[in-house]
Amino acid sequence: MKKILVIIITVFMVAGCRNMDSFTISGKISDPQKKNIVLNRVEVDRLVFIDSIKVKGNGSFRFRLKAEHPDFYQIGYSDTDFITLLAAPGEKISMTFRGKNTSGDYEVTGSKGSEDVRMLDLRLAEGKRKLDSLRTVYGNLEGDQASMEERTRLEDEYTSVLQNLRKKNIEYIVTNPSSIAALKAVYQRIDENTYVLYDPR
């Protein structure tokens, strides 16, 4: 009996160690448009190809990777249609994509870092949509006195959206100083030349 117990404990310990040096990503795409899903690791100045797998007929896919520490990854159809994960050893990440694009509506569980990255990305996307809408309205105004008042209102609203994004990112960084996801909050951009945290004042 003791020998059996020792064997069982050993098996669980080995399995536990094996699980802690790898992570899995299991996903389901409700409307798969392409055959393959690509996984890249994000490094400072480049993407490193990790794997590409075929999406099954029911829209499911699964990756299993060796990992020694948390890292950012891009998963999606291409370099322009993807989402970002922050995967750590031992995690069992589950994903659901609801649209035609992997960069669209999705859910992720089983990874606190990836859930936080999703929150940051969705908040930025919503902020950028508001800013784009304000730019469009602003550009369509005519140059009369009434439009001058409207311009001022739109400029104030534009500034308010930027300040709110900046405030939320700072709050996340301050409350999650040990999370690698805080790096995402630091380096998010409104456009190619403007960081969310940049304040011109």
What does each of the following model-derived ranges do?
Residues 199-201:
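Alpha-helical repeat scaffolds
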Residues 14, 161, 189-192:
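A short structural micro-motif
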Residues 17-167, 171-172:
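A non-transmembrane, solvent-exposed segment enriched in polar/low-complexity residues
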Residues 1-15:
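Sec-dependent bacterial lipoprotein signal peptides
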Residues 178-192:
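Amphipathic alpha-helical repeat scaffolds of TPR domains
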